[in-house]
Amino acid sequence: LMAGMAHLPEDRRREIGRDALTVCRQVAEDEACGRTPRRMCPLNTAGRCGLHSHRLMICRLHGVPHELRFPDGTVSRGQGCPVFTGRFPDRDYIPFDRTPFYRKLSALEQEFRKAAGLDRKFKMTIAQMIAHDPDIQP
């Protein structure tokens, strides 16, 4: 993500930084009022990612049908976004079990955290990652 940001012109980085700070403020306000935050990613420009070639895995999978199997046996399924489902009108559901990929990703994260001596989890949105980056000055 940050490697992609580094390739952008400075004025665009500043604009994204301002947008990220705005999104973070809006999310905090939503949460303070008991609302579920639903805010657009600060990298979004006219429905497209401004860092398309550097986007995160979760972004690459957005809109694709999914299936997740939880340890308690429950299964969560999503059919995907209308653009995806519109390409396959004759199919009610296209199975894509992400569980093995997320397990591998979790194992990689644990391995990295152990090697780096990190003892806490980091759960940040893209807006938060950008807003907390000292190299991004709005």
Task: List each model region and its residues.
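Short loop/turn segments that flank or connect secondary-structure elements
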Residues: 2-138
